[in-house]
Design a protein with these regions (language model features):
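Solvent-exposed loop/turn segments connecting transmembrane beta-strands
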Residues: 110, 114, 137-147, 169
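Outer-membrane beta-barrel transmembrane domain signature of Gram-negative proteins
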Residues: 8, 19-129
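Outer-envelope beta-barrel architecture signal
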Residues: 2-4, 59-63, 126-130, 146, ...
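Short, solvent-exposed amphipathic alpha-helical segments in soluble enzyme
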Residues: 82-83, 149-151
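Surface-exposed extracellular loop regions of Gram-negative outer-membrane beta-barrel proteins
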Residues: 10-14, 19, 71-76, 80, ...
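Transmembrane beta-barrel strands of outer-membrane/channel proteins
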Residues: 4-10, 63-71, 116, 132-136, ...
Length: 205
C-alpha cells in the first residue's frame, strides 16, 4: 500500500492593545497600539509504503517505510513606534500593558527538515506482539538525529496483558523559540536609559 500527502498550514497572531497609553509621551500618546505581528507557516510532503512480510508465523508481519520533507517559516513584524517609544516625560515608557516589538527585533527565518522512518511489527506468538521503529531526521539548522523505539505486549489471558516500551527521542526548538527577540528600554536611576533584551540563539552575545 502506498500513501502520499501534501499539506500546508499557516498561523498568524496580530497583537494589538486598546484603552492604554504610553505615559512618557504625555498628551501626545495614543490610546490604541499595534504591538506586533507573528506568523508561522509549514509545508509538509509525505510518502508512506506498507506491505506484509511472511516469516512463516501464524500471522504476517507488517513493514512500514516513509519519507517526509518539511519547510517551516517564522516571521515577526514590529509594532508602531508609540508602543515602545521613550518620550520626553520621565514616566514608564511603552504601552502600559507591555511595550511593542521594536524594528531591531523583527525576525524572518526558515528551515528545512528531511526525515526517513521505518516500522516493523508482528505477532510472534498468539500471546506476544512486538514492534520496532527507527527514524532519522536532518534539520538545516540543527544537524541530524536518529531515534528508535522497541515495544512489546504479552497477553497472559484475554483479559490481562502487560505492555513495555523503550525509546529515544529528539526535539529541536521551534523557530518561534530559537528566533524570538524582544527589547524593553526604560529609564533607570537618574534617568539613565537601559535595555533588557531577550535574544535569539543566533545572536553572538
Amino acid at each position: 500500500y502506498y500513501d502520499a500527502s501534501l499539506s500546508f498550514g499557516r498561523n498568524g497572531f496580530d497583537y494589538g492593545l486598546n484603552h492604554s497609553l504610553n505615559a512618557s509621551l504625555g498628551e501626545a500618546s495614543p490610546t490604541r497600539f499595534q504591538l506586533g505581528d507573528y506568523t508561522f507557516s509549514q509545508l509538509t510532503a509525505n510518502l508512506d509504503a506498507t506491505r506484509e512480510l511472511n516469516f512463516g508465523m501464524a500471522k504476517p508481519a507488517y513493514l512500514a517505510l516513509g519519507a517526509e520533507v518539511r519547510r517551516e517559516r517564522f516571521q515577526t513584524r514590529p509594532g508602531d513606534s508609540a508602543s515602545y517609544q521613550i518620550g520626553p516625560i520621565e514616566a514608564p515608557s511603552g504601552a502600559q500593558a507591555g511595550p511593542g516589538l521594536q524594528p531591531a527585533d523583527a525576525a524572518r527565518v526558515s528551515r528545512y527538515v528531511a526525515g526517513l522512518y521505518a516500522d516493523l511489527s508482528a505477532e510472534l506468538t498468539s500471546s506476544l506482539y512486538a514492534s520496532a521503529a527507527l527514524r532519522w531526521d536532518r534539520y538545516s539548522d540543527f544537524g541530524s538525529a536518529a531515534t528508535g523505539k522497541l515495544s512489546a505486549r504479552y497477553a497472559f489471558t484475554p483479559e490481562v496483558a502487560a505492555r513495555a516500551t523503550v525509546s529515544t527521542s529528539f526535539r529541536a526548538p521551534s523557530l518561534a523559540q530559537s528566533a524570538f527577540s524582544f527589547t524593553v528600554t526604560d529609564r533607570g536611576e537618574g534617568g539613565v536609559l537601559s535595555q533588557v533584551r531577550t535574544l535569539p540563539v543566533s545572536n553572538p552575545i
